[in-house]
């Protein structure tokens, strides 16, 4: 099965410094290719095979040229041009209000596994998948930037906030 991510989606990386907050929005119009989804159903679990979303670092916009440059430097974009998110498995939560997913995320060549609850709501032409994933960038051997001789420090804690409008495509 193939799915496509519609322009009604949003994917935002949020962070803050000791001075202010920032967010880097992904240009969802770049989701032009369909994504192959392959899974095996095992009772209440779906186990996925090679179901990946590649986010090109250069398609994030942090609202200011200097912040974009710092963002790409932090992620080592010259060496690792994209973030890879791989869906490993999914199963219903006991409360039936959310689905617990297991994701493998690769940032700057470092891979980490996360369990994240997501909400899935049916829409007229597909589903809306929503979630929020807090990440410590130190887990990926990344050092948050410092500015003005260290007076401005960016927190190592970020959040990936996503609302993906997904529909099956032939």
Predicted regions mapped to residue ranges:
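Low-complexity, acidic/polar, glycine-enriched regions of mature
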Residues: 1-170
């Amino acid at each position: 099965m193939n799915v496509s991510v519609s322009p009604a989606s949003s994917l935002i990386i949020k962070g803050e410094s000791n001075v202010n907050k920032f967010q880097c929005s992904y240009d969802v119009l770049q989701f032009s290719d369909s994504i192959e989804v392959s899974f095996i159903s095992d009772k209440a679990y779906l186990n996925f095979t090679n179901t990946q979303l590649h986010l090109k670092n250069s398609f994030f916009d942090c609202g200011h040229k200097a912040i974009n440059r710092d963002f790409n430097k932090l992620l080592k974009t010259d060496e690792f041009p994209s973030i890879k998110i791989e869906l490993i498995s999914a199963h219903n939560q006991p409360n039936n209000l959310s689905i617990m997913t297991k994701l493998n995320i690769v940032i700057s060549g470092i891979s980490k596994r996360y369990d994240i609850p997501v909400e899935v709501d049916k829409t007229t032409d597909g589903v809306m998948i929503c979630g929020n994933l807090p990440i410590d960038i130190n887990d990926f051997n990344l050092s948050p930037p410092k500015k003005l001789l260290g007076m401005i420090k960016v927190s190592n804690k970020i959040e990936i906030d996503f609302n993906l409008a997904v529909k099956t495509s032939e």
